[in-house]
Design a protein with these regions (language model features):
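Hydrophobic anchor at the beta1->P-loop junction of P-loop NTPases
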Residues: 6
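Conserved glycine(s) of the Walker
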Residues: 13
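Post-Walker A alpha-helix
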Residues: 17-18
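Conserved nucleotide-sensing/catalytic segment adjacent to the nucleotide-binding pocket
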Residues: 24, 28-75
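Switch/connector loops and helix/strand junctions flanking conserved nucleotide-binding motifs
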Residues: 64-66, 93-100, 127, 146
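C-terminal accessory "lid"/substrate-recognition subdomains
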Residues: 118-166
Length: 166
């Protein structure tokens, strides 16, 4: 059993990674409330659980007070020697601005008072504590969806199947 935590700035490819893992047999949860991470980990690592691999996305859509607790929760889980992998996806701000303008989606932190650039910068600050704890960081700035899929398959899924640790 393994718990994979996917985090990163909006527009960096987290949903794509979750879909890839789901296609490979992972049980995936997008936008898990950070306050439920500890409970989920306890459930995943009990003897009764038959789910071999779980992947969750935790990002800036969370309540900020809950998001601030993620590093403490991750440290607690790591101290228990649980098999947890933290993958942090990112892209440079210019690429994220372009992706949001092309998709016409609203950034989760933007509103009538906070523009897109400011929201992207704020998100970097919010997610920095998770970023520094990651076991794998992937910069998707110059990656196509196809390249990201191949990278995830090669670095995570196939290495898991052969028992190679990243």
């Amino acid at each position: 059993m393994k718990l994979t935590i996917i985090s990163g700035r909006s527009g960096s490819g987290k949903s794509t990674v979750l879909h890839i893992l789901e296609d490979r047999g992972y049980y995936c949860i997008d936008n898990l409330p950070a306050s439920l991470l500890h409970s989920l980990a306890n459930r995943v690592f009990t003897d009764e659980t038959t789910i071999p691999n779980v992947a969750v996305s935790i990002d800036a859509r969370n309540i900020s007070a809950d998001l601030e607790q993620v590093p403490n929760i991750l440290n607690d889980l790591k101290e228990k020697k649980l098999p947890i992998e933290i993958i942090f996806l990112d892209a440079n701000s210019q690429t994220l601005l372009k992706r949001f303008s092309e998709s016409r989606r609203k950034h989760p932190l933007s509103d009538e008072n906070i523009g897109l650039k400011e929201a992207i910068d704020k998100e970097s600050e919010l997610l920095e504590p998770i970023s520094v704890m990651s076991s794998l960081s992937i910069d998707t700035s110059n990656m196509s969806l196809h390249h990201l899929r191949d990278s995830i398959k090669n670095r995570i899924v196939e290495n898991k199947e052969t028992g190679i640790a990243l």
